[in-house]
């Protein structure tokens, strides 16, 4: 029997917040409540995340800290049959920022926040465990920025994005030969980039009028080189293919000697030879599965190109109390044509993604109910990058719509904000191939994520 290969279908595909691709846009409670439509003005040090050029608006040292919690779920269907629910539990996405004015019109800023994230979890016995049982990705950016006010109306900034990127996945891989699965190998693939990869960003803000301002932010590609380890162990053997193959082999051998069904010796000879060859074939197959699992154990590596993006936005003060904003983000997810995993033995795998570029559009409004209390709300439409015939169960298919409300309260030098949002995922479907080459239809429905956030700022 030939060597059996583990079909490792590891790939990177969904986010904790059900955002398109695996990008995260939750930089602060106020930013969440306004749908990211804060490109033209800064309120706190989270400007490091949304548009660092607006750091020039801040006077004095400002420290901003907080977190967003996410809980995504979805009902999944495989080949038209109800399957296990996707429910990874609750994730916490912390953020921390500082802004410090400097002489000669400069402002220094530093942001620490997750830019990328993934979290999916299925029951270990769900029908696509060969694709994934659970996957977690963390992409945390350490982002120093320097803003400069060229004039009272125009400011610019430049920054470095030092990225820590980690990947962790459990799956039940197929041990495959000639299109047949002979067993299941429990696989645990993990790794990170050691925080050695970086990119950059540029932004600008211009006050068109006293009430209208515009902002733009560009983020570069980041090429991440992930190194880690692949752990394997045999979960179970599948002898169904062996039984079928031995049966056909014995029948062919008997027919070659003129013994076919109906011959008086057929049943006796069939049982004799079947018993003889079946045991040997099973022992050999089990040995090959064990060898395949052992060969896949060891150091692993992968390369991932994080996409470039461009965000543009406007902010308009309708009155002294009513403020409107919009933000549009283009992300070049098409740069992720495929992901190449370098695994021990002969188990290297190229996972085709062929994603589409996406647009994310947000509209936000804020109303100053009192001098200290502001009410906020927003709506976001977020495109799904997946193509119908390329994908994995880690990314339930479908565009996202997000509705968020929130408030901000000024108390002395403190600025406290909180938000709550619902992420609605449109039901859709895609096709995934298993290790034998068979195609399966994955459908999602009732996709929903709860997103709650709180952020506190202090002005020194």
Q: What are these regions, as identified by a protein language model?
A:
Residues 1-19:
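Gram-negative bacterial Sec-dependent N-terminal signal peptides
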Residues 17, 29-36, 43-45, 50, ...:
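Residue-level signal for pocket-adjacent positions within structured domains
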Residues 20-32, 78-82, 91-460:
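Outer-membrane beta-barrel porins/channels
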Residues 24-38, 56-73:
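Transmembrane beta-strand segments of Gram-negative outer membrane beta-barrel proteins
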Residues 36-43, 72-90:
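Surface-exposed strand-loop-strand hairpins of Gram-negative outer-membrane beta-barrel proteins
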Residues 39-61, 98-103, 150:
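Outer-membrane beta-barrel pore proteins
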